[in-house]
Amino acid sequence: IAEIQAAIVALRQYQPVVAVIAGSVGCFGGMSIAAALCSYLIMTQEGRLGLNGPQVIEQEAGVQEYDSKDRPFIWSITGGQQRAASGLVDAYVEDDRQQIKQQVLQYLTQGLPDLHRSSNYDFYLNHLQGVDTTEQATPLQVRTLYQGEQA
């Protein structure tokens, strides 16, 4: 996975690298880091994005902390609609091949972003420092965490 991540960083200097997170499998672990390194992220309703998957979090923290079978809760935290509303992805589209293709082509035509998300780490670190980790975050808290000026 590290080689994939290095290739993304090398390629994005020259042209946009677009990640699509669709379907019900989700994008977790090292591949979520690879996705975050891309120039643009596109997600669908069924897509999920997070550093750890629901089952891993449940295994480590317990079902009281994170119930991996509670699908509405999982999507309310890591789903495509939530990630788009949180500003962590660039586009939220229907899980439709033509819509996904159209969005990918739009980003390729648009060119490189002014600032890649992964280069803006100070913004994210500053916001994360204010998070109360003693309580389970609500979907609304997740949505509002990164709102505001990002560059």
Which positions does each model-derived feature cover?
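Intrinsically disordered, low-complexity segments enriched in small/flexible residues
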Residues: 105-151
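Conserved catalytic cores of soluble enzyme domains
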Residues: 1-114
